[in-house]
Amino acid sequence: MSGEPSVRLVQQSDYQFAIYYNEERDPIYGDEPPPLGRSQGATPSQFLLAGVANCLSDSLLFALRKFKQNPEPIETKASCEIGRNSENRLRILAIHVEIHIGVPGHTLENLDRVLAQFQDFCTVSSSVSLGIPVNVTVIDSDNTKLYPTN
């Protein structure tokens, strides 16, 4: 299907690849850190984190805008735990995403409803979380933790 997401990778040197997500735009680059690569691009783990974090940020923004709420600016940070599995192979064991919204949470209508549902509409994190735990935190401009509420 032509509407399905796709990318094209072209090896540049060693482990560095040009990644074309749109043939009409310049590529972004992926690479491995030394000793395999030269850190001339994001690592595959960083691309995974970016995909999860971007999708969750989009989903939260979309859900709030549905109620005509403006949480901007949004800044999201993502990190992961990497460890070895039972076969001693490196794996991403967990992903942590922290979404910071640019306004106090108490100024946003329907926030509780949005926070209870927005992750369910994130295609990437919902898919990734089938194999890797994805832990999400939402914090407002007053540095109040809005989600999870425990």
Where are these regions (language model features)?
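Extended beta-strand/beta-hairpin segments
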Residues: 1-50, 61-150
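Alpha-helical metal-binding/catalytic segments enriched in His/Glu/Asp
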Residues: 55-56
